[in-house]
Amino acid sequence: MKHKICIYAIARNEEQFVDRFCDAAAEADYIAVLDTGSTDRTVEKLSDRGVIVRQTTIEPWRFDVARNLSMLLIPRDTDLCVCADLDEVLLPGWRAALE
């Protein structure tokens, strides 16, 4: 059985990592990112790559709130979730290793 996998993340001003992140996560069924106030092209680049991306502001900053909000972007039919940062790179074969 093939599982539906979602890679999800929180981002802010990480446009320099978007392409590398999306390329590494390309085997995922879904990629979802909660942007917490970027002033660069992070949101635009993620959208252009087909990522599920939403924007919010969290004041005062609370990582737990950001993480919980990011999880709301995960589609309901997802079987496995992987949390990553945009500056992280998934190793080749990551999907097969999970399945």
Roles of regions detected by a PLM:
Residues 4-6, 30:
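Cell-envelope/extracellular polymer assembly enzymes that use nucleotide-activated donors
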Residues 68-80:
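Active-site nucleotide-sugar/metal-binding loop of Leloir-type enzymes
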Residues 9-27:
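Short, well-formed alpha-helical segments that are part of the catalytic scaffolds
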Residues 41, 64-65, 86-99:
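Acidic donor-binding/catalytic loop of UDP-sugar-dependent glycosyltransferases
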Residues 24, 34-45, 58, 85-86:
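A conserved acidic beta->alpha catalytic loop
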Residues 16-19, 40-48, 93:
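Acidic helix N-cap motif at the loop->helix transition within catalytic regions
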Residues 58-66, 71:
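A short, glycine-/small-residue-rich helix N-cap motif at loop->alpha-helix starts
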Residues 27, 49-50:
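Short, structured coil segments at secondary-structure junctions
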